[in-house]
């Protein structure tokens, strides 16, 4: 159990670091990031909402206050780098390694979250 917990926290820490770095780049280096977005063919209005959602996702995963929000954050943390990976491969700019690492850390974190904290089911609608 202790080994699983260590793996979980390392993977979650690395996943959080990647997405926090990405969000900080989006917020503090807007001009540079907007150039990347234009090069990849994405609209630049996505930059600030993505940064905010990445930060909120990290909070949802680390606090575990809502199982639904945590699962939603994990889904977003998987979709974002998958789409980034595809975009980088299509453009052939060679900048795809961070996306691959984010995918690996996200899957590892999600898998070991289930092992350490239990596989749970949540009722999304109130039951009577």
Question: Can you say where each PLM-predicted feature lies in the sequence?
Answer:
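Extended, low-polarity transmembrane helix blocks
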Residues: 1-22, 62-128
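Membrane interface segments of multi-pass transport proteins and intramembrane proteases
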Residues: 2, 39-42
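Core segments of alpha-helical transmembrane spans in multipass integral membrane proteins
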Residues: 17, 21-24, 42-62, 76
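Membrane-interface helix termini and inter-helical loops of multi-pass transporters
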Residues: 30-40
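Short, surface-exposed linear patches
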Residues: 41-42, 48-49, 82, 106-107
């Amino acid at each position: 159990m202790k080994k699983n917990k260590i793996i979980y926290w390392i993977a979650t820490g690395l996943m959080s670091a990647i997405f926090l770095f990405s969000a900080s780049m989006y917020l503090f280096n807007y001009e540079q990031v907007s150039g990347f977005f234009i090069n990849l063919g994405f609209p630049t209005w996505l930059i600030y909402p993505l940064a905010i959602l990445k930060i909120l996702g990290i909070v949802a995963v680390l606090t575990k206050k809502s199982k639904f929000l945590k699962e939603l954050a994990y889904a977003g943390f998987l979709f974002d780098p998958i789409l980034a990976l595809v975009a980088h491969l299509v453009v052939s700019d060679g900048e795809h390694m961070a996306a691959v690492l984010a995918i690996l850390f996200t899957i590892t974190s999600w898998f070991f979250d289930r092992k350490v904290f239990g596989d749970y089911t949540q009722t999304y609608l109130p039951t009577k």
